[in-house]
Regions:
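Canonical radical SAM enzyme core domain
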Residues: 1-42, 49-61, 79-90
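Radical SAM enzyme [4Fe-4S]-AdoMet core and its adjacent flexible, acidic
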Residues: 41-57, 64, 68-181
């Protein structure tokens, strides 16, 4: 429409992902974001089911299958780091060890009173983790086990989207988000 190109992305926690949905996603979606907060203990702490059981063991095999079905392209494993996993480079390495090639991990956005909220005093540790991650990526690349980390691929000359930084989310400024309820 009017020389516009629309790209469709879906984000999933993987719980309801099955072969039929995977087929639809691979046919209709340009990109897929797979929400996995980190290593098993981190993910299960942040994403338990109502019965208290963690979701990691259910979703990881589904995510691996989907990533392979897309030839390790046009998807991202998207993690979230919190005060509970400021050592998030270990989560990225865990994703790589699971066979994923496209990764992202972002800081949690929450009220400062939340126990998992990142605090100003955590910033030096976070900066250290990004440096550590860069070194680990170089080593993995030398070993023939390279992977992409989304935030190291951003055009630094273009700068971050101001609206996204102000709202902590690109929804409504860069993209349209639709909840399960429409």
């Amino acid at each position: 429409i009017h020389n516009k190109h629309f790209r469709f992305t879906i984000t999933t926690n993987g719980v309801l992902l099955n072969d039929e949905i995977q087929e639809f996603v691979n046919k209709e979606m340009d990109n897929v974001v797979l929400s996995l907060d980190g290593r098993k203990e981190i993910n299960d702490q942040m994403r338990p089911f109502r019965n208290g059981k963690g979701s990691y063991d259910l979703i990881v095999p589904k995510f691996q299958k989907l990533a392979e079905s897309r030839n390790q392209e046009k998807y991202y494993i998207r993690g979230t780091f919190t005060r509970n996993n400021l050592d998030f480079s270990n989560d990225i390495m865990h994703f790589a060890d699971l066979g994923f090639k496209q990764m992202s991990i972002e800081p949690v956005v929450g009220d400062e009173s939340d126990p998992y909220a990142i605090r100003e005093e955590d910033i030096p540790k976070i900066m250290e983790e990004y440096d550590k991650l860069a070194k680990m990526m170089i080593e993995r690349e030398k070993e023939g086990k390279g992977f992409n980390f989304f935030h190291f691929m951003i055009d630094l000359n273009g700068g971050p989207c101001v609206a996204k930084r102000l709202s902590a989310c690109g929804s409504g400024t860069e993209y349209l988000a639709v909840t399960p309820w429409g």
